[in-house]
Amino acid sequence: PRDAFLHWVDDTAPPEAVPMSLASTVHHLAGFWEGRDRDDIVLLHYDDLQVDLEGEMRRLAGRLGIDVPEERWPTLVKAAGFDEMRRRADVTAPDTETRIWKSNAGFFNRGTTGQWRDLLDEEALARYQARLAELAPPDLAAWLHHGSL
């Protein structure tokens, strides 16, 4: 895992040429980050969804102009929860038709963030932090790691 991670971090090919690298990921997200105040862009962060799923769902519905009857919220929030999404992975995981996952439920893994910290040594983490600092402004880097706009 370490070598694959460092290849992902260190790849210097143009972001549009390499679809799976830190540079391409940051390049992709930076466009949305720059437009985050536009009406047609809504940024959601997994950590924020974990902390307040219902609040984030209500925020999204509000931004999209969707009126949800109050009595429907508990059902919607339950359906969008991690355990329920994982239980229904064959319809909720992305690209279920192509079977890119060994198991669709595996897409949902453990439902936690920061698992990579336990897999990487200090040198690999330092390389990641340095490369991210080259690629992303501090506010985007902070949001990528912690969420909350």
Where are the regions a protein language model picked out?
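Conserved active-site carboxylates
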Residues: G111
